[in-house]
Every structure is written in structure tokens, then in C-alpha cells.
């Protein structure tokens, strides 16, 4: 059974490093926004094992018109668990949490090869593809949230 929990930023580093940035040092897996006011980190546990992580921080996106936005960063699921729907469970949980707190949109710089994954979750492309040196092609993806406020 999958369980989504708030985790510490330190709990994200191993999976971030292993899945997203294996060619970089663990220090390069730490983002300046990790400790920003309002930031939070979620993990999905399967039978007590942390299998999926993501970080969220209040950050506007110049191409978005929504006044209140959060950025998703460091989304990753361990290879052996990708058929468990941990990532989509995590994203849906975060979208609900953000909408409940009045956040109007969530966005990310998605790796180009996974943009279809976000599209299936109702996210849309924004702007033109771009390259992040050493990591690869990306596209901004976003979703407008239905707030309860």
C-alpha cells in the first residue's frame, strides 16, 4: 500500500542523486529553495520503504499569469517501483494540498522525455523547449489548481 508523507529535505537527497543526477555530486542535488519559507517535501512509502520523492517551493514562473504559484522540483521514483503509481499519487496529493492552501498553479521544468507523463495528469506545456547543460532538454509544464478559497 502507498502512503504519502511529509519528509525532510535530507530524506530526498539519496533518490534525487541516484535517479536525477547520478553524474553530479550529492551537494549538487541540494537546491537553494529546499529551505525557503513555505517549501515542503513529500515522499511516497511502499511497505515502509521510501520509493518516490518531490519538493515544492513558492516560486513564480514568468510565463504564468497566476498570482500564487509553487514549483515542483526533484521529482523521482525508484526504478523498481515505477509501476506502483507512486509518482502520480504524490503529485495528486501535492495538488490537493496546494489548492487547499489557496495556491493557484504548480509548475516544473520537466525533462522533455517525460512531458507525456505530466500531460496525462492534466499538466500543460508552456513556452519553448530549452536545454539545461549537463542534464538535457526540458519544457515548462504547469497545472492551474482549483482552489477552495
UniProtKB/Swiss-Prot annotation:
Listed InterPro entries: Acyl_CoA_acyltransferase, GNAT_dom
Transmembrane segments: none
GO MF annotation, one: N-acetyltransferase activity
Top EC group: transferase
Residues of the N-acetyltransferase domain: 2-146
Key words, A-Z: Acyltransferase, Transferase
Its EC number(s): 2.3.1.-
CDD domains per UniProt: NAT_SF
UniProt record similarity statement: Belongs to the acetyltransferase family.
Protein name: Uncharacterized N-acetyltransferase YitI
Provenance organism: Bacillus subtilis (strain 168)
Lineage summary: Bacteria, Bacillati, Bacillota, Bacilli, Bacillales
